[in-house]
């Protein structure tokens, strides 16, 4: 993996990500920073991060259509809004609100403790929905569930076609 972009960013902020198709891993950074690394076939892909106060915009564009991989490291406590064109996403347990949209692919989100959430809204138009921490599993067409708890964070995940898995770790 080759580092393509890196910026300091304090924990507790919010990051909005626009990701072209590919295989992505989102995980906690070793400190208060955003770091983007590319691997596999990087082609002419680019990474851009802009920050204003406690908000950051991150874009990965012009990704090739075969074997593109990227790792995005963010502070352990961060609110995330993520838009993925298509591909595979694996998100480690990041503390904060999460909003994830993907048209197609496989999305796996480590939610940590389900008691940290006040509301969960997850849907898959065509495919499998596994949400073990929230005691829910469905497959087929138009899978959707909502869940309410006593925590302070929200999780919204919407996938067009593929598999959506919400897991503890």
Protein language model regions, located:
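Short, surface-exposed interaction patches in beta-rich subdomains
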Residues: 49, 55-57, 61, 92-94, ...
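Extracellular beta-strand/beta-solenoid scaffold signature
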Residues: 2, 66, 140-142
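Active-site alpha-helical segments that house and flank conserved acidic catalytic motifs
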Residues: 15-17, 82, 122
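Gram-negative (and chloroplast) outer-membrane scaffold detector with strong preference
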Residues: 69-70
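Short linear S-[DN]-x-LW-Φ motif typified by the pepsin-like aspartic protease active-site region
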Residues: 1-51, 109-111, 118, 156-169
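Membrane-spanning beta-strands of outer-membrane beta-barrel proteins
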Residues: 9-10, 75, 115, 150
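A mature extracytoplasmic/lumenal domain signature
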Residues: 19-21, 28-32, 38-42, 62-64, ...
């Amino acid at each position: 993996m080759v580092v393509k972009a890196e910026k300091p960013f304090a924990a507790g902020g919010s990051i909005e990500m626009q990701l072209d198709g590919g295989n992505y891993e989102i995980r906690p950074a070793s400190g208060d920073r955003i770091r983007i690394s590319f691997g596999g076939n990087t082609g002419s892909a680019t990474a851009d991060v802009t920050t204003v106060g406690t908000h950051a915009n991150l874009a990965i564009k012009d990704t090739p259509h075969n074997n593109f991989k990227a790792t995005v490291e963010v502070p352990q406590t961060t609110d995330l809004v993520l838009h993925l064109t298509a591909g595979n996403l694996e998100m480690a347990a990041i503390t904060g609100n999460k909003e994830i949209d993907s048209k197609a692919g496989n999305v796996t989100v480590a939610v940590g403790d389900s008691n940290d959430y006040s509301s969960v809204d997850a849907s898959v138009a065509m495919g499998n929905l596994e949400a073990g921490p929230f005691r829910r599993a469905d497959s087929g067409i138009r899978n959707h569930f909502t869940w309410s708890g006593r925590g302070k964070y929200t999780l919204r995940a919407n996938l067009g076609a593929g598999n959506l898995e919400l897991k503890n770790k």
